[in-house]
Amino acid sequence: MFSNYLLSLAIWIPIAAGVLVLATGKDSRAPLARVLAFMGALAGFLVTLPLFTGFDRLSGGYQFTEFHEWIPLLKINYALGVDGISVLFIILNAFITLLVVLAGWEVIQKRPAQYMAAFLIMSGLINGAFAAQDAILFYVFFEGMLIPLYLIIGVWGGPRRVYASVKLFLYTLMGSLLMLVAMVYLYYQTGSFSIVDFQNIKQIPLGVQQLLFAAFFLSFAVKVPMFPVHTWLPDAHVEAPTGGSMVLAAITLKLGAYGFLRFILPIMPDAARYFAPVIIVLSLIAVIYIGMVALVQTDMKKLVAYSSISHMGFVTLGMFLFVNGQLNDWALKGAIVQMISHGFVSAAMFMCIGVMYDRLHTRNIADYGGVVNVMPKFAAFMMLFGMANAGLPATSGFVGEFMVIMGAVKVNFWVGALAAMTLIYGASYTLWMYKRVIFGAIHNLHVAEMKDINCREFAILAILAVAVLGMGLYPQAFIEVVHQAANDLIAHVAQSKI
């Protein structure tokens, strides 16, 4: 019985839990709010596990589908479904949300109930965006999740939190207005807002495809974010609380890349081929130039934020590598796998920075040094996650990058060579930060007073370490889920609509 409503449960359990936590009200009831938030996040995660275990890896199309009329007059429906791509993102989102609730357990003292509730509600809305099969439903969830994210940064962020949250909101909202117009145009072509109907339009002139591409691309490129519309992300990360940075990097950025897979590539394949060289150049700029920018950062959060832009450039590169008019198999699957890996690794890196910030209240690299002498367990975890961020073999960070490089070399040797620069820059800025923060002599008396990670922090980092190593050592568990959906997308994009 419940299997018919798993996606609805994955959406509405976190939202309902968030409302319940919000109802606890005053800070004096913070212990109750934390327990309810944990139970809600745990229930939200557990309900996604049957999606993974029950997913038919050999079957194409959408599974766990639901359909209910919402606004019949406009043919807007509550339609849900997942394929091998979206199912992984829903599970990742629920997983990270659970860890974020634990990460803020003792740290957030100001309005903890509202803080936890914002994350739970945002988690449900993000799941809705990944599961939506109706364009307007997708738009509602896609834009709705901005509200709790705006509040998380604007209320619990750093000194410049208002500036960062407004910048985030304006960038992402303005980019989405044209997408709504494009959806209305597609509605008039199909007679419905069904995303599947959009994808199955037989004929769209190239000029129209290019206009639609521009409308959708602006919205999704800002969310990824791609160069040059990336400037909101470092500010948002620096000002966001630890949990906000974890979700922003691990989940929110993936919504933009997911939009490329769900809308741009299948609906506008000819325009995607036409603009692919431009996307490849912008992606390589993100990989190389933004990697160089990360090298000169003095703030740990800002360094990892630029690292995220560089890694997401790798993702968009993999999505737009065409060979003889067809998407490259290795590169596309590698891009999807890289997104899942980046979810684990980026969340872990921001958690590590948060652990140090909670003790020393600074993110300046120069204020640290010799941390390994007082926090050896923490230093070991940060080394693992740093190496995964650099793409070390046997970690999750290597798998997707290697697959994209394989696909890039098949398209053009020099594109592959330039893409491989991410491994060099990733190692450079990660080791540069690690050496100055973790190794060396203690020259700050406050560092000497730092305590090693507690049981709660150890549990969070250990869970993320298992995910990073598990995916690195046995990536097939993830690749086999993605395989059929990626093949279906490749076959669909190969058919011209001119």
Show which residues each predicted segment covers.
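Transmembrane helix-loop-helix hairpins at membrane boundaries of multipass inner-membrane proteins
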Residues: 1-6, 20-117, 192-200, 487-488
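Structural signature of hydrophobic alpha-helical transmembrane segments
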Residues: 2-13, 82-93, 135-148, 209-222, ...
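Central hydrophobic cores of alpha-helical transmembrane segments in multi-pass inner-membrane proteins
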Residues: 8-24, 38-51, 92-104, 122-124, ...
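Alpha-helical transmembrane segments of multipass membrane proteins
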Residues: 18-23, 49, 98-102, 124-128, ...
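C-terminal ends of transmembrane helices
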Residues: 19-27, 97-109, 151-160, 224-238, ...
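Alpha-helical multi-pass transmembrane bundles of energy-transducing inner-membrane proteins
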Residues: 27-32, 117-121, 125-208, 293-306, ...
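Juxtamembrane/interfacial segments at transmembrane-helix boundaries in multi-pass membrane proteins
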Residues: 55-77, 176-231, 235, 260-278, ...
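Predominantly late transmembrane helices and immediately cytosolic-facing juxtamembrane segments
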Residues: 227, 346-350, 416-449
